[in-house]
Amino acid sequence: MTAQIIIAVPKGRILKEVLPLFAALGIVPEPAFGDEDSRLLRFATNRSDIGLIRVRAFDVATFVAHGAAQLGIVGSDVLMEFDYSELYAPVDLAIGHCRISVAEPVAMAAGDDPREWSHVRVATKYPNITRRHFEARGVQAECVKLNGAMEIAPVLGLSSRIVDLVSTGRTLKDNGLAEVETIAEVSSRLIVNRAAFKTRAGEIGPLVEGFRRAVEDKNAA
């Protein structure tokens, strides 16, 4: 019996944008998949050859890179941070739009010019992206790795600035921070394990093309 194709999907709000793409491919997950409060990690679909797992965004790339899942949906921020050679990202799904930005306290931003920075201490869950960004400008970046609650770091003196994902900017504003620089625009991508794409091309190839057509049809609508 041929093993299932496993598609890894990140937890959170992106689920609502993923479901229409699955529907366009004729993939219908079990009801619990759309429930953000469900503690299940693995889900069945209407197709016996396709299963889903729902994990943290950073873990999607790891599961696919190591072959535990054959396909995944993940933000381009994760691909920029980890740069796995085992991953192929053939389709920009045009969902999950946001940006990676530098932010600092509003009072500091009022008289600050990023072009004059020579050294920064930054709290972030993206140390690799942050270092590369500042190194390219000749700025020394000291990164404090956090997995969440970045916005409170400047308040408590852990760092003077943060680098984080920004969507509406509401969370920054609520915590007295101002966005001062955009590092990169972010959207969700379909990723594929390179080895699986070669060995199971007959199964994976049509799925990749299905996602591509779904995005094209959505953009044309």
Swiss-Prot record:
BP terms from Gene Ontology: L-histidine biosynthetic process
EC code: 2.4.2.17
Protein's pathway: Amino-acid biosynthesis; L-histidine biosynthesis; L-histidine from 5-phospho-alpha-D-ribose 1-diphosphate: step 1/9
Keyword ATP-binding: yes
Keywords: Amino-acid biosynthesis, ATP-binding, Cytoplasm, Glycosyltransferase, Histidine biosynthesis, Nucleotide-binding, Transferase
Enzymatic reactions: 1-(5-phospho-beta-D-ribosyl)-ATP + diphosphate = 5-phospho-alpha-D-ribose 1-diphosphate + ATP
One GO term describing the cellular component: cytoplasm
Localization (cell): Cytoplasm
Keyword check for Iron: no
Family matches, as InterPro entries: ATP_PRibTrfase_cat, ATP_PRibTrfase_CS, ATP_PRibTrfase_HisG, ATP_PRibTrfase_HisG_short
Gene Ontology terms for molecular function: ATP binding; ATP phosphoribosyltransferase activity
Pfam family membership, one: HisG
Function recorded in the entry: Catalyzes the condensation of ATP and 5-phosphoribose 1-diphosphate to form N'-(5'-phosphoribosyl)-ATP (PR-ATP). Has a crucial role in the pathway because the rate of histidine biosynthesis seems to be controlled primarily by regulation of HisG enzymatic activity.
Subunit structure: Heteromultimer composed of HisG and HisZ subunits.
Domain text: Lacks the C-terminal regulatory region which is replaced by HisZ.
Family the entry assigns: Belongs to the ATP phosphoribosyltransferase family. Short subfamily.
Name this protein carries in UniProt: ATP phosphoribosyltransferase
Source organism (scientific name): Rhizorhabdus wittichii (strain DSM 6014 / CCUG 31198 / JCM 15750 / NBRC 105917 / EY 4224 / RW1) (Sphingomonas wittichii)
Biological classification of the source: Bacteria, Pseudomonadati, Pseudomonadota, Alphaproteobacteria, Sphingomonadales
Encoding gene, per UniProt annotation: hisG
